[in-house]
């Protein structure tokens, strides 16, 4: 296997411009094609030749919204990565040649948080495109720790690049389902069911045996698709106030034969304030609200309602690497269908891909494939 002298990459050389007086971002970040040295690989580290990297909402937050990355620009974004191991440091030689999914969150596995089994929120975690130094997925290669890589033994005729979406879009909902203690027969509500994570949240919930699964979003065309991808019912929230949405939700619950205010597992997948407010407003007795999407806004909520309802609000960050093989199995067995929900484009189209992803008009997740 050929080992390059340089890594070809699309760096975010500058973050978005923030106007303090106006209190808002006035210009997006800047991307530049460049090359960076291949680092000397340490013990347990490998170099992965990237097959594909998904364009995620998190990347948009860094590039357009001013959410800070742990490593300051210049750095390369991108954390949904699949590829082939082409080189290794000491002790990781057996990984060479393996086709892998790179976890979006790679924990240290030695700290107190990791000892508690919450490795996905390790404070020393390495996340490509954020806290893995300058390295990210919109590149030809990436150096990563080997210990938590997910091996793909058989591609089953699917392009290796397509498996990139497992590294966040498909695994994040699985982690959220575990955090919610989701079980067969649980009623589920998903806000943002048409988004890059929401479409997989519905499929994961269905695989867990949840019923009914109700999805909310604002795009009618995408909502129709959601009915073929795990949802039993959908609600278009566009131009509706909370009371109208609540009445529609209650009618659906009645039709499905379940109580509208008892035991719902709610997955908020947008990170948008309006959707978060809906999710909070519909949280009822012994229910659980799992916060999956990230946003910078604040919400107003009477936390005494949690006491009165004996309800829970839970955060869910990324996914434990140990769950990746299970999600891979769900994809390969057909329980999670990824192929209709993605499209591959050459990485040279990254600037246009970012614009389209930021616009919110995409119907498929873009996976960029290196063409340096």
What annotation goes with each model-predicted range?
Residues 1-5, 273, 277-281, 321-372:
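C-terminal hydrophobic helical "lid"/dimerization subdomain
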Residues 1-82, 140-144, 369-372:
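Short N-terminal strand-loop motif that marks the start
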Residues 80, 98-99, 113, 141, ...:
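Residue-level marker of beta-strand positions
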Residues 97, 147, 155-240:
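Mid-domain Rossmann-like dinucleotide-binding core that forms the NAD(H)/NADP(H) cofactor-binding site
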Residues 180-181, 194, 208, 224-312, ...:
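Glycine-rich cofactor phosphate-binding loops and adjacent beta1-alpha1 units
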Residues 219, 295, 319:
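Residues in the short beta-alpha loop(s) of Rossmann-like NAD(P)-binding domains
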Residues 288-290, 301-340:
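Rossmann-fold dehydrogenase core element
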